[in-house]
Regions:
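Juxtamembrane intracellular "pre-TM" segments in multi-pass secondary transporters
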Residues: 1-10, 189-228, 410-414
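Substrate-agnostic recognition of the 12-TM MFS/MFS-like secondary transporter fold
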Residues: 11-28, 51-64, 70-85, 102-160, ...
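Residue-level recognition of membrane-helix boundary sites in multi-pass small-molecule transporters
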Residues: 12, 43-47, 73, 102, ...
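Short amphipathic helix-loop junctions that connect adjacent transmembrane helices
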Residues: 29-42, 243-254
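Short helix-capping/hinge motifs at transmembrane helix termini and TM-loop junctions
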Residues: 40, 52, 63, 93-97, ...
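C-terminal transmembrane bundle of multi-pass solute transporters/carriers
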Residues: 68, 72-74, 78, 83, ...
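Hydrophobic alpha-helical transmembrane segments
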Residues: 100-111, 136-194, 256, 260-264, ...
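A single, central transmembrane helix in multi-pass transporters
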Residues: 163-170, 211-271
Length: 414
């Protein structure tokens, strides 16, 4: 691990991810709560989440581009562009022009850019790390991308409570600027990319969709299809729950602590993924029983609106399994997919797994408005329980071996 940290490119990517995540925590909490505060409706919260989560579908179409652009240049420019974009919110606020629709437009744009940034960073790992270092590298990047939110979300809630929403947006802009400067120190070799040989627009479009098809081909195997099918509805449910969290929480501190609980669960899951004993457990059992635990934890969570401590623990417990699965899913794709197609594959995997999330946001907003946030969380959790039942009845999932036997499964798939 020390050797990896001394790798300049990996260190820059890791540190850049951490700095950006701090700013993102401030922005995500501030903008989500501001939308709910200005509108007073979970319909608007759900609609905003619908718009931001819809960018994952756009990522599915744009993912082949990741293999054909100057990734270093893209990472740098994307950070500076977001730094400017985020300042529009406090600027409009200063002149009394800010309304909920401005935030609902800016949030999806930033979300779309970030949907491409993280897969882009992940696609660079095979170019700077050996195959033996990939699992550890992915684990560290996952911790930086998701696990660090446990700390940053807590700080964000405190900062917003003490300093206000606009301070959060200024701090976020500064974090983007710092990360953009940091990415300037990436090696020049990471600027190289596949140059298009085709000259005509028709061939460029044809080539783009061929690359997209190559990324989607990964999911033709019936075992992977059953797994991804379940994940689609898990994301649908999780997003419906996220849409009503501002109403469920009632204040900045509780909301930020719930997001921190989610981050802590993902962090512990990422760390736990490397434990030898866990690698010996059948993935089928891990997925089925894991989702049952998630569903039951969140059903209980829906009844603890007035108990912050218990609520945060139960909500965080539900995200623990996700942290475990993320590490192995990314590593699997990186090993079986050629380096020149890794960007397409990573983008396709994330895009497909979040396909139903936007509709989940709309459903959550509707249920929260016309019933209650607690009932919306209960319904979302019950859908996850149904996914666990579906996997238990699916022999392709039940027969998945342990992680230690995963290479044999990949050989059969290929």
């Amino acid at each position: 691990m020390l050797k990896m940290i001394k790798n300049k490119d990996f260190y820059v990517l890791l540190l850049g991810r951490l700095i950006t995540n701090f700013g993102d925590s401030l922005y995500a909490i501030a903008s989500t709560l501001l939308v709910y505060k200005m509108s007073g409706s979970t319909i608007y919260s759900g609609l905003t989440l619908f718009l931001t989560s819809s960018t994952a579908i756009v990522q599915l179409l744009l993912s082949p581009i990741l293999d054909k652009i100057n990734m270093k240049k893209f990472l740098i420019l994307s950070q500076f562009f977001q730094a400017i974009l985020i300042l529009i919110i406090p600027f409009l606020y200063k002149f009394g022009k800010l309304n909920v629709y401005h935030i609902m437009v800016i949030m999806p744009i930033i979300s779309l850019i970030n949907q491409l940034v993280y897969p882009g960073q992940i696609s660079l790992l095979p170019k700077i790390l050996s195959e033996k270092e990939l699992v550890t590298g992915n684990s560290l990047m996952t911790m930086a991308y998701q696990g660090s939110n446990a700390i940053f979300d807590t700080f964000a809630g405190v900062i917003i409570s003490l300093c206000g929403f606009m301070t959060a947006f200024f701090a976020d802009s500064i974090s983007f600027i710092l990360t953009g400067i940091l990415f300037c120190f990436l090696s020049k070799k990471l600027s190289y990319f596949q140059k298009r040989e085709e000259k005509s627009k028709e061939n460029l479009i044809k080539n783009h969709f061929k690359s997209l098809k190559d990324g989607l081909n990964l999911f033709k195997d019936s075992r992977i299809f059953a797994l991804v099918f379940g994940i689609v509805f898990i994301n649908f449910s999780a997003t419906s729950i996220s849409a009503v969290l501002p109403a469920f929480a009632k204040n900045e501190i509780f909301y930020s602590l719930m997001l921190a609980g989610m981050g802590a669960g993902l962090l512990l899951g990422s760390l736990f993924a490397g434990f030898p004993k866990l690698k010996e457990i059948s993935l089928g059992k891990l997925y089925i029983y894991g989702m049952m635990i998630v569903a039951l934890a969140w059903i209980l969570f829906s009844n603890f609106q007035n108990n912050i401590k218990v609520g945060v623990v139960l909500y965080g417990l539900g995200w623990f399994v996700v942290g475990v699965v993320n590490v192995y899913a990314q590593t699997m794709v990186q090993i079986i997919v050629p380096n020149e197609k890794i960007g397409s594959a990573m983008g396709a995997m994330v895009g497909i797994s979040t396909f139903m999330a936007p509709l989940g946001a709309l459903l959550g907003g509707y249920l929260g408005e016309y019933f209650s946030s607690s009932k919306a969380i209960f319904i979302g959790s019950f859908i996850i329980f149904l996914v666990a039942i579906f996997w238990a009845l699916n022999k392709n999932i039940r027969k998945l071996p342990s992680v230690n036997e995963f290479n044999k499964v990949l050989e059969k798939i290929n």
